[in-house]
Amino acid sequence: MATVGMNDVKNGMKILVNNEPAVITETEYVKPGKGQAFTRMKYRFIKSGRVVEMTMKATDDVEVADVVDTDMRYLYSDGEYWHFMDPDTFEQVQTDKAGMGGADKWLKGEEDCIVTLWNGTPIWVQPPNFVELKITETDPGVRGDTSGGGGKPATLETGAVVRVPLFVNQDEIIKVDTRSGEYSARVK
C-alpha cells in the first residue's frame, strides 16, 4: 500500500487506520515555538461512522486506503442482500445490511447511489440526496389540534417513518431529504 507524509494529508483523503478505512474530516498543522511540528487530524471510520481525533508527528506517515466511490444503480433486495449495478460496465455487486449504512429505508428501486468499494467489496452506500416516495399510512390531519407548528408521523412505501405537515394526506407522493430524514416538499 502507498503511504503519504503528514505534509500531504488533506481533508477528504481516505486512509487506513488499524486496517479499517477512514476519511479525514479535519487537519491542522501546528508548529509550536519550541519543539517539533505536528499534525492534529480528525477522521471518520467509513464502516462504523465513529469519529476519532489523533495527533501525529510531522515525520510520521499514514497508509492510503484503496477505497473507490462508484456511481451505481440500485436494482433490488432479496431480503438478505441489496444488489447494485454499474451502469457503464453492467457489473453487479451486493452488500449486506451493515454495508447499507441505513440507506435501505430510502431505496425502492432504480435509484442512482454512490457505493464505496474497499478491495472490490461495498462497505458504504450513499443514497441520492432527495427521493420521492409514496405515503402508505398517516393519520388525517385536523386543523386546530396543535399548539405549535404541528406535524404527524407518516409511513412511506419503503417502511421509513418521517414527520410531515398536517396538510399531507395518505397516498400522496412526497420528497424526502435522505441526509436528514426530513420531509422536503409535496410532489404534484
Swiss-Prot record:
Disulfide pattern: none
Major site of localization recorded for this protein: cytoplasm
Family: Belongs to the elongation factor P family.
Modification N6-(3,6-diaminohexanoyl)-5-hydroxylysine occurs at: K34
Function comment: Involved in peptide bond synthesis. Alleviates ribosome stalling that occurs when 3 or more consecutive Pro residues or the sequence PPG is present in a protein, possibly by augmenting the peptidyl transferase activity of the ribosome. Modification of Lys-34 is required for alleviation.
The gene coding this protein: efp
PTM remark: May be beta-lysylated on the epsilon-amino group of Lys-34 by the combined action of EpmA and EpmB, and then hydroxylated on the C5 position of the same residue by EpmC (if this protein is present). Lysylation is critical for the stimulatory effect of EF-P on peptide-bond formation. The lysylation moiety may extend toward the peptidyltransferase center and stabilize the terminal 3-CCA end of the tRNA. Hydroxylation of the C5 position on Lys-34 may allow additional potential stabilizing hydrogen-bond interactions with the P-tRNA.
Species of origin: Xanthomonas axonopodis pv. citri (strain 306)
Keywords: Cytoplasm, Elongation factor, Hydroxylation, Protein biosynthesis
Pathway: Protein biosynthesis; polypeptide chain elongation
Keyword Transferase applies: no
A single GO BP: peptide biosynthetic process
GO terms assigned for molecular function: translation elongation factor activity
Subcellular location: Cytoplasm
Gene Ontology CC: cytoplasm
Protein name per UniProt: Elongation factor P
Keyword Protein biosynthesis found: yes
Record InterPro entries: Elong-fact-P_C, NA-bd_OB-fold, Rib_uL2_dom2, Transl_elong_fac_P/YeiP, Transl_elong_KOW-like, Transl_elong_P/YeiP_cen, Transl_elong_P/YeiP_CS, Transl_elongation_fac_P
